[in-house]
């Protein structure tokens, strides 16, 4: 692992790796992120934000400053970099999101662990001809994102406290599910 550039190496099993990989993809590594940014995009749009601003406050915020801070300084640093008004918004979003996120993530983990998730994927592929899966990049948000990304100024990407609260709550919920597993 170290020869491949991994900074850490730990003992594991193939079963543990498969469970954590599939669970991770369904959770905060991919599936949950998509759900979070799509839901918050719709919320911000319903509150009057333009399409571009809603994209910046969701997808750009998560993939920009939120992820960068977590990668370099840890999850708590996201909260610590906010002023008191933004901390209150973060806290409200975190508290509202943690328990439902943990419940959904626990169900995902349980389905992966017992094999139901893999069976579901196989069954979905058998139905694909009649019920094709949609493309995630076909939504309004992702079309708007094409233009926003072209005009991106990295230093101007906002750290949205509500988006950060939901994202960090979901990340902590996933960590807690894995610690219990």
Task: Describe the residue ranges of each PLM region.
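Conserved anion/nucleotide-ligand pocket segment
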Residues: 1-7, 24-25
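Catalytic alpha/beta core domains of metabolic enzymes, predominantly
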Residues: 14-28, 32, 153-166, 170
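NAD(P)-dependent Rossmann-like dehydrogenase/reductase catalytic/cofactor-binding core
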Residues: 2, 38, 46-181
């Amino acid at each position: 692992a170290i020869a491949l550039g991994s900074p850490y190496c730990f003992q594991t099993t193939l079963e543990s790796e498969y469970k954590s990989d599939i669970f991770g993809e369904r959770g905060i590594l991919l599936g949950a992120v998509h759900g979070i940014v799509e839901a918050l995009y719709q919320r911000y749009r319903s509150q009057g934000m333009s399409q571009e601003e809603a994209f910046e406050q969701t997808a750009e915020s998560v993939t920009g400053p939120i992820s960068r801070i977590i990668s370099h300084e840890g999850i708590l640093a996201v909260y610590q970099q906010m002023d008191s008004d933004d901390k209150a918004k973060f806290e409200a979003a975190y508290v509202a999101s943690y328990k439902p996120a943990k419940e959904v993530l626990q169900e995902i983990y349980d389905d992966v662990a017992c094999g139901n998730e893999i069976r579901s994927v196989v069954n979905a592929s058998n139905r694909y001809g009649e019920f094709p899966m949609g493309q995630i990049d076909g939504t309004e948000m992702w079309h708007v994102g094409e233009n926003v990304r072209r005009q991106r100024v990295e230093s101007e990407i906002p750290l949205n406290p509500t988006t950060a609260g939901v994202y960090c709550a979901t990340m902590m919920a996933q960590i807690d599910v894995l610690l219990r597993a």
